[in-house]
Amino acid sequence: MSHRHTAYVGRFAPSPTGPLHFGSLITAIASYCDAKVHQGKWLVRIEDTDIPRIYPGSEAHILACIDAFGFQPDGEILFQRDRLDLYENVLEQLKAQNLVYACQCTRKMLGSNAIYSGTCRNLNLPFQNQAIRVKVKDQLICFDDRLQGIQCSNLAHDLGDFVLKRRDGIINYQLAVVVDDYMQGMTHVVRGADLLDNTQRQIWLGDLLGYPRLHYLHLPLAMNAQGQKLSKQNMAAALDLSKASQYIQQSLAALHQPAVDLDTPDRMLKQAVAQWQLNHIPHQTRLAGTYL
């Protein structure tokens, strides 16, 4: 499958499962600078399909951060909760092509097995009130990450058929992100290395749907003092909007970018774009040092 031969379109796509933290800001700044240095568009998408995990107030904090840190999205902010019918339509398309099947396996039944064995693949179960899995093949899927280099995975060996819709009716992240990246005309994805192993799944699904492949860049992760990646699950501190300029300086330093003058956030971002050096970012999955 070929790549899109169009102007750069990138995005920042946080989930409102908690407030934005320093690790989130690193991703936002890197994706913004990379888009702007290529004279591209930078879009914001709120990935809020997993309703039970949404944390009260986090969406408002995300939107406040976008404004306070001087980001200027090139279009309206998209909310996945408004697009559930679209995802269902794509699922129907996959059903019609016999590329997915219903699965009745529970977490208890699967136990600790990381690789799904295909228990339900040939049972022809009704789709109602069941999870929906997409079929994978025994083949190698590779992509050339712009920072991490060549990445390969055989989904049949490493993962097995994976879920696109949960039995509780929640659309899985993998389906929603692939559909939205295509519908929004995305060409480039800049995100954290914690999502590196999601990429082959998304490439596989995009190939099944006939979507052009994207260009990927997976950033090294900021870590806390315990050696854990900064995340909502690890209780990373929420960004303090009153310290936006200082956070921008710290984020650029973490990415090994040239220093920018302490100024208003929007002016600092403009200077960061003008000085952006992708080859300065460490070619690893973790950043040295600790970040609170």
Swiss-Prot record:
InterPro entries: Glu-Q_tRNA(Asp)_Synthase (IPR022380), Glu/Gln-tRNA-synth (IPR000924), Glu/Gln-tRNA-synth_Ib_cat-dom (IPR020058), GluQ/Sye (IPR049940), Rossmann-like_a/b/a_fold (IPR014729). Catalyzes the tRNA-independent activation of glutamate in presence of ATP and the subsequent transfer of glutamate onto a tRNA(Asp). Glutamate is transferred on the 2-amino-5-(4,5-dihydroxy-2-cyclopenten-1-yl) moiety of the queuosine in the wobble position of the QUC anticodon. The lineage of its organism: Bacteria, Pseudomonadati, Pseudomonadota, Gammaproteobacteria, Moraxellales. It comes from Acinetobacter baylyi (strain ATCC 33305 / BD413 / ADP1). ATP binds at K232. Its cofactor is Zn(2+). L-glutamate binds at R11, F12, A13, P14, S15, E47, Y173, R191. Belongs to the class-I aminoacyl-tRNA synthetase family. GluQ subfamily. A motif ('HIGH' region) lies at residues 14-24. This is Glutamyl-Q tRNA(Asp) synthetase. Zn(2+) binds at C103, C105, Y116, C120. GO terms for molecular function: ATP binding; glutamate-tRNA ligase activity; zinc ion binding. One of its GO terms (biological process) is glutamyl-tRNA aminoacylation. Its EC number is 6.1.1.-.
